[in-house]
Amino acid sequence: MTIGLPRAMLFYRYGALWETFFKELGCDVVISGETSRQTLCDGIKYSIDECCLPSKIYMGHVYSLIGRCDYILVPRVAGYGGKNDVCVKFNALCDIVRNTFETARVLDYNIDIAGGETELRAFLRMGLILGKSAARTLSAYRKARLAQAAEDRRKSELQEKALSRRDGMKILIVSHPYNNYDRLIGRP
């Protein structure tokens, strides 16, 4: 079984988590390519005008995965609890993808801490959908969490190293990871 990961939006925050999780479950993983002008054009074609640029890019990445995998992962995130609500696009993307690409098999998971949908619970549900036991899914999730923590440390160390350099002027750009790390919109 092959799981497609769109290289956009939350991928830049949770890519290591997702890739490790699915590989630990014995799935093949295909990640869409770096964002290109064609990715953006495809995303614009399949989006309404009012969608933000990152959402249009996301749709282009989803389009690029159709026919290349058994499922495309499209997470639904309503909120992390308390004052950690997220932009509505993270709650809506799953429905938008399903309604736009009717032939695509979407694998989703829901996170809504206030509604009792934790990340662990969501991953256990995905494992069941993929026909995996709860024990194997839990083991895969734990390994994936460790991989994501290592990736977070690596990125933090790179940022600290860049900021500690003494040569020349530094300009700090504060943005969402899906803007900063995207090759098309996050680079000069």
Residues covered by each model-derived region:
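An N-terminal assembly and electron-transfer interface module characteristic of large anaerobic redox
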Residues: M1-P188
